[in-house]
From Swiss-Prot:
Name this polypeptide is given: Extracellular metalloprotease MGYG_00389
Gene Ontology CC entries for this record: extracellular region
UniProt source species: Arthroderma gypseum (strain ATCC MYA-4604 / CBS 118893)
EC number: 3.4.24.-
Family of the protein in this entry: Belongs to the peptidase M43B family.
Signal sequence annotation: 1-19
Enzyme class: hydrolase
One Pfam entry name: Peptidase_M43
Its biological purpose: Secreted metalloproteinase that allows assimilation of proteinaceous substrates. Plays a pivotal role as a pathogenicity determinant during infections and contributes to the ability of the pathogen to persist within the mammalian host.
Glycan attachment points: N49, N53
Amino acid sequence: MRFSVFLPAIAALSSAVAAQRSCGSIPHKAFSNELKEAMENSRTSSFSNVTSNVTINTYFHVITDGNTGKISDETLQKQIAVLNSDYKASGFSFKLVASDSVDNPTWAAGEDDMGMKSALRKGGYDTLNVYFVPMLREGLLGFCYFPMKNPSEGQKIKDGCVINSNSVPGGSAQNYNEGKTTTHEVGHFMGLYHVFNEQEGNCQQDGDMIEDTPVQGSASSGCPTGKDSCPQQGVDSIHNYMDYSYDSCLTEFSPGQIKRMQMLWQFRAGSGSGSVTRPRPKPPVLMDYEHRL
């Protein structure tokens, strides 16, 4: 069942341009603690070996509401190519094992995240699942879950990245339609923070705890050459995939970020490659969108 009053609204939202990148990835406190422990242990022989040259099995799930949100196979191939190009220097590559398309108005509206993933997720904790959704709350371009050392079954199911389908190569999200949103969100999947401090103007802390990304007090927009938001040495990392610059401006991960990803891959590899145990999904809950508009 669909609510006709909702369809024009979602169609309008799906074609709206993104004024500024907005990411909904928030690290769990447990991840922050585990990261600090891993950084400390990295100085010992038991943690000296970092992972490199890993191929990550990847599944794309395209969520639609009728014609809204449809993505061609050609575009999905372009998206995986962008991902592989951007991560080439890291030693990680992504193999698109399969893709599927599901018509579900509830999921297309960014609702029932757990139900969607319970029904569609494939592979183990070391598998990347990407869900392309045409409308996300609060204008988000995407969000993704950070790796956990000992994830619960529920955390394994919720794992993966949800991406605004308008941000794929050739999409309608102006300035954010070269596929770099997926690159950015997968950075969180690999254990990376934003290069900027989440508290606007905070220059007292190194937000991502990586030495070769200068302290940055604000997210970037556009491609502001020479931007320097903090007095410490080094200008802002406007070309870094973990900033908020336009897609055309994003070109790199730092060596320190690459080392961080390689170090934290053990969180995912250590949790096994077997399929996640999924609960029986509940029928989608159809909200009364007439009262939301």
